[in-house]
């Protein structure tokens, strides 16, 4: 069968009704990146596919087709811990929306796929007291790196110099951390101590946590190019006093 793919590890990142009884499903896959498939009959009441094609559920999928839009042939549901805690669900919807809206079609990134699975596993283990922000920041970082926007927290790209405690720095999404504090930069006044803490892996302490949130917000918005993320509103609606998580 031409264009056939079998037993491909995949997750549903978005789905919607298509024509009379089908679903149009966006998948994030290990070896093919983001792919769109038509699941024929999946939107009918008698089809088991509708219950199986759920977000956060690991799948093995078969599809066929030579065009960009493939046809789902078969799928196998794999076991995994459920993502059920409300903030974990909202966070999962957020990373799914990032993948669905920004990742190019048919551009595989095994490293990002591994980060995606790791993030879902951590979200499944999240308790009501756990902090979700470090998980989101790490995924955002891996997501940006997969698109060519990686950077070092502790080195300036405009001078190649190491970040110093006690100094202030800027951030440009097209470059990374910079020593230049030009007015046109989207972020300035980033404390060197916080950047060094982030380079050491500290996403929990107050100053690096806030700095990472500011930087990754600017970077994600840059990658979105004006496209909205509906999942962001879930955080503010669930806890208006806490501010935006993502």
From Swiss-Prot:
Pfam families found in the cross-reference section: RecO_C, RecO_N
Domain of life: Bacteria
Keywords: DNA damage, DNA recombination, DNA repair
UniProt xrefs under InterPro entries: ARFGAP/RecO (IPR037278), DNA_rep/recomb_RecO_N (IPR022572), NA-bd_OB-fold (IPR012340), RecO (IPR003717), RecO_C (IPR042242)
Gene Ontology, cellular component aspect: bacterial nucleoid
GO biological process: DNA recombination; double-strand break repair
Described purpose of this protein according to its UniProt entry: Involved in DNA repair and RecF pathway recombination.
Xref: PANTHER family: DNA REPAIR PROTEIN RECO
NCBIfam families documented for this protein: reco
Family, similarity comment: Belongs to the RecO family.
Protein name: DNA repair protein RecO
Biological source species: Marinobacter nauticus (strain ATCC 700491 / DSM 11845 / VT8)
